[in-house]
Structure formats: structure tokens, C-alpha cells
């Protein structure tokens, strides 16, 4: 069995789960010779790579490592991705989160369509409509290809408190609205997008723009009280300012917080 990743989380796994004996501990970039008594190797040092079972401890770049292993002929069933396990639970694992057959889902920060795809699976395809807001042109194209389903609309704009144009840093999963950056994008408020129509579930993971986007969803939230799943870890003040804002719109909300990584990143506030 191979532990892939000799960084912080690889160290935690070998230290706390010391009853597991690893045949290899590997890393693409070795910063030391040993990790808690294990020699840190490279993949080239493993003789029969395809016969091994790989546990990938890396949380943020697990997709690149998954591709690396698959390109080497490692079957998917031999790869356990800890980062993927944590990520797939986001937005849908809260036991109090219930879905009907006529959900209207707003996915602000759609990335490559993975969350919208998961929404379709969770609802067994029984929903009213899906709106994906993704200003990154490449990722918006991926969304259209991955979520080619009925009543699914990909809006190539960023969620904000108004319709305007803003500087944008194109960086795949961490694309961010900035004061100065390499691209200019169009933005839209959720209230304007829906134009008085209802939403039943709003998810936001937009790299620090959540507060502004919630300002632009005030009328929708006040009128329809949709379920919310909002990232509250991008800015230091988000963890208290975002709950205050949501409760100012509707004090009947009950708030729940879940963290989907070992680092405190991927902390989501649910409002139901």
C-alpha cells in the first residue's frame, strides 16, 4: 500500500494511524528523506506500480495526482483520494437538508459543473431548474458539457450585488474578483437573474465575493427563504458577517456550520 503525499497530512496519517504499515511513502517533491520513520520515495522507485493501492493524502491538488496515476495505468479502484471524499460531501450531506421535486438551484461559482451534477444525482433528476453562474469562460464551457440536462442554464457571469464589470483573476477553482487582475468579467445579482422568480436552494463558493453576492440576493431570500449553502472561510470576517446578514433578511433561519477539510478551509454555513 502506497501513501502518496509526504506533506502535512501525510505526516498526520502516518503519525496518528500508526497501526497501518505502508510499503511506500511517495511524493513528487521530496523536502526530506524520511517521514515519521518512512523513507520518502519517488514513484519511479516502485517496481510494480499497477499492483499497488494508493491513498492520496493531498487535499488541494488531488486531481493532478489522480491524472498522474491514471496516466501510468493505475486503475481507478486502486486509488483512494481523501480530498475528493471530503469535497463530494459538500453542500448535500447535512441531514436537515431536504429536497422536493420542484427545486430551483442557484449554483454561484459553478466551477466545472461538478456541484450541479451532484445536485441532479441527489434529487434523482426531479427538479425545476438549475442556474450555474461561472464567469471563467473555459470552466463555463465545461459546465455546459458536463451538465447538459433539461432546464439547466449556464450564465457566464459572476454573482455580485449589481450588474457591472469587474477585474477577475482566472485561476480555475480559485478564480477571484479583484481590484486589478488579468480579465474583465460581467456580473449580475441573483435578484436580477431571477427577476422575481423563486429559488429554493442557493449555493455560493465564489472566493470571497459571497457577502456582495448575498447583498444582491436580498429580495429573493426575504421573499422565498431558500435553503442556503454559503462558503464562510475566504475572508476573516465572513464567519460572523455572513450569518448576521442572512439573519437580518430572515430571522427564522436556522444556521449550521460544516468544515470539509482538515485545514479549516471549505467551511460552509447552511441556512434552513
PLM segments and residue spans:
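Phosphate/nucleotide-binding beta-alpha loop and adjacent structural elements of enzyme active sites
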Residues: 1-20, 28-272
